[in-house]
């Protein structure tokens, strides 16, 4: 079993905005229009397709790309006071990885997409994004207990157990739906509002983010 968590005060506050996108990507994605969301989705399904169970231990901020990382994991456990959301919808685009409707249901997903507001770790567990939430003080200990239970099952059986759930989700269209969603993210990057926001970002990150 694999546990993914953040070092320091948060799980993940999003993509590294200082990264040079002109560099080769770690996964194959042709650099045509929409290459970035395709690359993100491909990376998410690398975790999805692992035979080993993957657990996300979420504390502090879990925003934008951080929510995509957590959503790709098999089990998600949050601190009660964690903050999860995709604030980028206020200024640029929907998520690269369209997992919200699948995990949260239509109404909860729509509210997050139209407002850009965050939810707490406790709400994430209530809404279906996470399995459970715990107080921050005991989160790691509780996740270790769960990981120990998962690890007791033989790995060959666990691989089939994991795949049995994924097979049903894929029959319902989850993989195809998330992959198709990359086209909407790519389309959003051509909107006038997004182009204007990118100009604002180049002038000053904090000022641009504070505006939205």
Say what each PLM segment does.
Residues 6-42, 206-208:
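Glycine- (often His-adjacent) and acidic-residue-rich active-site loop
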Residues 11, 116-121, 141, 145-148, ...:
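C-terminal alpha-helix plus adjacent terminal tail
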């Amino acid at each position: 079993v694999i546990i993914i968590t953040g070092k320091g005060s948060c799980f993940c506050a999003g993509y590294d905005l200082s990264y040079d996108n002109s560099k080769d990507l770690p996964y194959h994605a042709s650099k045509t229009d929409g290459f970035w969301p395709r690359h993100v989705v491909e990376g998410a399904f690398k975790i999805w397709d692992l035979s080993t169970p993957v657990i996300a231990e979420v504390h502090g901020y879990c925003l934008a790309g951080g929510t995509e990382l957590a959503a790709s994991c098999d089990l998600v456990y949050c601190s009660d006071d964690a903050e999860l959301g995709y604030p980028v919808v206020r200024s640029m685009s929907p998520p690269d990885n369209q997992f919200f409707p699948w995990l949260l249901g239509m109404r909860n997903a729509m509210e997050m997409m139209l407002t850009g507001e965050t939810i707490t770790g406790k709400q994430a567990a209530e809404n279906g994004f996470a399995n459970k939430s715990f107080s921050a003080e005991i989160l790691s200990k509780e996740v270790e207990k769960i990981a120990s239970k998962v690890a007791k099952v033989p790995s060959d059986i666990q691989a089939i157990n994991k795949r049995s759930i994924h097979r049903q989700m894929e029959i319902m269209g989850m993989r195809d739906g998330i992959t198709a969603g990359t086209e909407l993210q790519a389309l959003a990057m051509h909107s006038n509002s997004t182009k204007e926001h990118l100009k604002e970002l180049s002038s000053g990150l904090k000022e641009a983010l504070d505006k939205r």
